[in-house]
Amino acid sequence: MKHSPLIASACLALVLMSSSLIGSTEARNKKKYVGETGGDFEFIDEINKNTQSNKNLGEHKRWIHDPSSDLCRPLNCKKREICLLEDEFSAVCVSKKELHKNRDEIITKAKYLEEEAKRRVNQQDNQDSQDAEDINNDDEDNSSDGGSSNSSPTGTNNAQASVQGNEETDDEDKSLSLGDDDESKEDDVFYENSIAAGDKQQQQQQLSQPAAGPSVIQQDDDEELDNCKPCPVAKPTFLCGADNRTYSSLCRLDYHNCIHSTSIRIACKGFCPCKEIVDGKRLQRISGYNNKYNKKISLDQQQQQQQQQQQQQQQQQAYKDSNNNNIMMNSGNIMGGNNNDFNTIMNDKEDNNRHNNHINAQYTFTPEEIKYDNKHYKYLKYTAYKKDSKYQEDKHKMRNYNEVVEKQQQKFNKNSNLNAYPSKSAECKPQQLTAIGNRLLDWFSVIMADSKKRRQHSQKSKAHFPPACKTEAKWMFGHLDLNNDGQLSLQEMYDLEHDQNERCIKPFIDTCDLDTDSSINTREWCRCFEKTDRPCAAVRRRIAGDFAGAYAPDCDIQGFYKPTQCHNSVGVCWCVDKHGVEFANTRTRGKPNCESVVNNAASLTSDDEDEGADDEDSAEGSADQMLVF
């Protein structure tokens, strides 16, 4: 018994030791929390980002693509960005990579407008159905109120009168409230047409009727609502009404007319506005502009005709005056004064012709100097003049040529025959006229070949030429005959006659006009060039006799130069084109192979025309000077 306290203390110590061991083992066996990331560091920002990204995966933003929008013009988007519209009023530069990454939806502006139109039509349909339900609910409330008033017990006569007065006021308030509801409904449905005069009178009569009539009005409203049948759910076929509003189907249009007591008809199929109406208005505007333009043109033509008539009268008067002067010269009266008057009359005539040529001119004929196979020619380039040009009225001054000042005065010999009419070619000798005819024929052939090489197809002349007419003359006649009437007028020959480098062209052309009617027909034109020669034949005719040791060109049947030309006395040969222009580095003793040289020159000239590089020191044409060795 003495050892009992010791035993108790030992037991207590054992119990404490065992409990401590058990606690340590439990602490060792307890698992450590590693978290969602497997024991790694956790960041709150990353978790939030992951959650936000998971939420955004299900949402795809819609963008509107409209390259022609005015909102995108001030934005300077980068190369890898594109301008898109968030809505109708805001534009943003969006990265293409982000669009692909987020899988955003991009729609066109037309699709967006179509969806908006469908949404508005659906809203309008829902509003119509809601209006019909509201009207039905109001009618049910009115009928319930009327039934309760009729079933209420009646007392004295005063009480009945007061009840009837209250019913009248209630009915008036209800009718007014119904009228207000109808007006608000009309605004919600975008109903723009005004109420017909008959409907207004009916409403006023209904409001002015005594209290005994509400039951009749309610019955009429119920009958109208029963007649307005709602539309079933079906695939929409959009229609544009006469009120410029879009309806989803014909049933919706009828339902709208039934509710609002209107008679709106179908304007066209599809969304409003109708294209036919827009096109019709556009055609009306265009027709109005055309009418104004035609009136202006007719006035201008009338003024031009009046001016032409006045000029013709002036020309006829000038001819009469010239004839009178000739008679006076024949009688021997005041010889010197008559000569001066005749010169002034001729100058006035040429000035009037020049002015007449430029009144109705639709083109200006600008001389352009070109080179063809080492030879200079003048080619008439047709260019349209500008309407607002300050030189429009006096276009002949643009050529720096004043015919009145530079033209020499014609001097008549006192001993000459007074009965003879002064010749138009008095300033040029017959030899000069023959030479200018040969040069013109050679020039016509060059222009014809150049136009064929350039593949410029001129209009075929409908005029009839004599059988013996030369090809160059026929081609040039069709080239100058702009209106294709078979006659060359003063206007069409103006630039050809008034060449400042060739003063004998106009006298030569004047000799062609045999009937002196100020125009040249095909017969006169061909006869004028009948006695002219082509370049080689012209040189041989000019040489006249065969001098000892003189060079005589070798011509073909048509009168052009043969490719190979030889000087027999010297023993030298060279190659030329058909106009007599010598090819460089071809002069040799013996006969060279001129056909290959001509073919190579033709290909080179076509390349030179494309590059615009020509030799400025080339020799002139064969008809301009005689070859002397």
UniProtKB/Swiss-Prot annotation:
Tissue localization of expression: In the wing disk, detected throughout the disk where it is localized primarily to the apical surface but is also present at the basal surface (at protein level).
Gene: Cow
PANTHER family referenced in this protein's UniProt entry, alphabetically: PTHR13866:SF30, SPARC OSTEONECTIN (PTHR13866)
UniProtKB keywords: Calcium, Disulfide bond, Glycoprotein, Heparan sulfate, Metal-binding, Protease inhibitor, Proteoglycan, Repeat, Secreted, Serine protease inhibitor, Signal
Disulfide bond entries: 228-258, 231-251, 240-272, 536-555, 566-573, 575-594
Name by which UniProt lists this protein: Proteoglycan Cow
Domain Thyroglobulin type-1: 533-594
GO cellular component: a single term: extracellular space
Gene3D superfamilies (alphabetical): 3.30.60.30, EF-hand (1.10.238.10), Thyroglobulin type-1 (4.10.800.10)
SMART domains referenced in this protein's UniProt entry, alphabetically: KAZAL (SM00280), TY (SM00211)
Site (Reactive bond): 233-234
Function: Binds to the Wnt signaling protein wg, stabilizes it and promotes its extracellular distribution. This is required for establishment of a wg gradient during development to allow for regulation of target genes at different levels.
Biased composition annotated in UniProt, kind: Acidic residues: 128-143, 167-186, 606-619
Region (Disordered): 118-186, 198-223, 298-356, 602-629
Comp. bias (Low complexity): 144-159, 301-340, 620-629
